[in-house]
């Protein structure tokens, strides 16, 4: 018996997925892509399999801004278990060390948290997707090799203690790109002198989607089974450009921009800009230098 092949089509937009625990970000993307029958898709930075929450998925022309969302500010809620360190810095790893948890109160923890706020140096978990010698660190760790995880500078904007009842506490973290919450929790555990690991992690938002209306994979499947138009379940690409200054071009200049030509105008705002037609259709992203030269970077075919 021959099985019918799925017919994929062009689909442009952003799905705000509520990723479930126990599945990788790429697996979640592939499930959503099959359900939507989208030809082209990409995610905007991995969430650990243990983690849940917002995973923006970009389809079609929106994949051209996936890297920009990867660099966005993000917010998380972390459930932390004190007294135990693990190989992965979360509940999925093997226990490395167990230590007694000191008597703590919120005032004591709040007094120590500022050590982890601002521009800080952070060692990545050895079980992470960071590459070393062209290979993810986790692949080396799984083979039992000694992994020297890199130390990188990251930015943590805020950490709020939401709950404390030792040996558990809950944190709300707002941070910049590249920050590992597992590393942050591990380092807090060392500051407290007892060690710690993440028991559960949820990503609340990714800029510019600070109040996201997320869909689970089950809800997505149900909506499509009920006959919903796939396009109606996605945000338009323009929603992902909200963090950039908008620059409108007239038809003549827009035609040049779409051909990849550079444009000069001292009235242009310096920095990265989202370029639009006069009728509000996004044409691409560009960079304006100090001389007012607009250099096309990503062009949209909408």
From Swiss-Prot:
Classification via NCBIfam families: TruB (TIGR00431)
An MF annotation (GO) of this entry: RNA binding
Gene3D superfamilies: Pseudouridine synthase (3.30.2350.10)
Species classification: Bacteria, Pseudomonadati, Pseudomonadota, Gammaproteobacteria, Lysobacterales
GO process terms (BP): mRNA pseudouridine synthesis; tRNA pseudouridine synthesis
Record has 4Fe-4S as a keyword: no
Pfam families listed in its UniProt record: TruB-C_2, TruB_C_2, TruB_N
Keywords: Isomerase, tRNA processing
Catalytic activity field: uridine(55) in tRNA = pseudouridine(55) in tRNA
EC main group: isomerase
Protein name (record): tRNA pseudouridine synthase B
HAMAP family: TruB_bact
InterPro entries: PsdUridine_synth_cat_dom_sf (IPR020103), PsdUridine_synth_N (IPR002501), PUA-like_sf (IPR015947), tRNA_psdUridine_synth_TruB (IPR014780), tRNA_sdUridine_synth_fam1_C (IPR015240), TruB_C (IPR032819)
């Amino acid at each position: 018996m021959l099985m019918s092949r799925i017919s994929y089509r062009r689909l442009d937009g952003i799905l705000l997925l509520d990723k479930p625990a126990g599945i990788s970000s790429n697996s979640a993307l592939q499930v959503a892509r099959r359900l939507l029958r989208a030809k082209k898709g990409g995610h905007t930075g991995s969430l650990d399999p243990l983690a849940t929450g917002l995973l923006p998925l970009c389809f079609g022309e929106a994949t051209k801004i996936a890297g920009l969302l990867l660099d966005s500010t993000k917010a998380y809620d972390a459930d932390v278990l004190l007294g135990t360190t693990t190989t992965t810095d979360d509940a999925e790893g093997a226990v490395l060390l167990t230590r007694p948890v000191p008597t703590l109160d919120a005032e004591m923890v709040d007094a120590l948290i500022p050590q982890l706020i601002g521009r800080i140096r952070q060692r990545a978990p050895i079980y992470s997707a960071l590459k070393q010698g062209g290979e993810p660190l986790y692949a080396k760790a799984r083979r039992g090799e000694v992994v020297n995880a890199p130390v990188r500078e990251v930015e943590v904007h805020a950490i709020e203690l939401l709950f404390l009842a030792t040996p558990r506490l809950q944190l709300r973290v707002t941070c910049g790109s590249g920050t590992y919450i597992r590393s942050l929790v591990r380092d807090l555990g060392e500051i407290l002198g007892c060690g710690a690991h993440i028991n559960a992690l949820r990503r609340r938002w990714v800029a510019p989607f600070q109040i996201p209306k997320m869909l689970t994979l089950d809800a997505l499947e149900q909506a499509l089974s009920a006959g919903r138009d796939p396009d109606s379940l996605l945000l338009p690409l323009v929603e992902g450009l909200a963090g950039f200054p908008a620059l409108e071009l007239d038809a003549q200049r827009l035609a040049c921009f779409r051909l990849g030509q550079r444009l000069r105008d001292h009235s242009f705002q310096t920095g990265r800009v989202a370029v639009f037609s006069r009728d509000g259709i996004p044409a691409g992203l560009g960079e304006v230098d100090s001389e007012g030269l607009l250099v096309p970077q990503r062009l949209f075919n909408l």
